[in-house]
Amino acid sequence: MKKNRFLTRMTALLLVLVCMLGLLPTAALAADAPSSIKLEDCTHNGVHYESPSLGTCWLHQMTFDYNQKSTIGFCAEHGKGMGWSLEGQTWGNPKPITDPTVQTMMAYYYAHTTGVFTDQAHALGVDEVWGSDYSWTMNAWVQAIIWRYKAGLLADPATACAEELLCVYNNLEHTSYSSIDDLLDGMSFRDRTQYILDLGKQGVWGECTVYEYQYTGSSTSSHQAKDVQAIMIGNLD
């Protein structure tokens, strides 16, 4: 009888342990990604450029409350709505994004706009914090890369990213480069992009955990809920 009670208790303890272990992935996800994020600020500067792959791209910056920290987010669906009338609205149902190009470019952006650099970045001297104007330009570049990822247009990451860098640079700096192999200050657009991606593979920009959030807010005077962009946002480790 005592032996049966002992076995019953051991079985119960094992079941509890299994249940606790089963909860760990969910708990880890919850720790990395809040269940919802809120738009704090959406700013459009009225500037746009043309991308052969994406069409017209308008420059904008969006700041979200992400784990009680103001964090830049990016639109995930080119052509859908986003604007100041959505400030205070929420996005939820986070889904992890594991594409290495997206993770690298978002880590690159966050590192240079927040000043959070790895020891490797400091050692290599790639630890310059961008000013406001340059941050807008780089925001447009990373935004275009995310849109291309969602459109399935990142088969050759270095080429795709270089093409968008060329478009952004030409339109915002009023230049007329025609090929990603053209030299800018002695280095081609292709080589610049490849260098950034290679450093990302080495962990120089840090590790960026990226999630995509779906709109869960209500319709506003300017945007119907069904037409609002999903958001990609990350946390730099």
Name each model-derived stretch.
Residues 31-216, 222-224:
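Short, surface-exposed polybasic-aromatic patches that bind anionic ligands, especially phosphate groups
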Residues 20-28:
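C-terminal segment of classical bacterial N-terminal signal peptides
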Residues 6-9, 24, 207, 214:
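A detector of low-complexity, intrinsically disordered, Ser/Thr/Gly/Pro/Ala-rich segments
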Residues 206, 217, 230, 234-235:
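C-terminal functional modules
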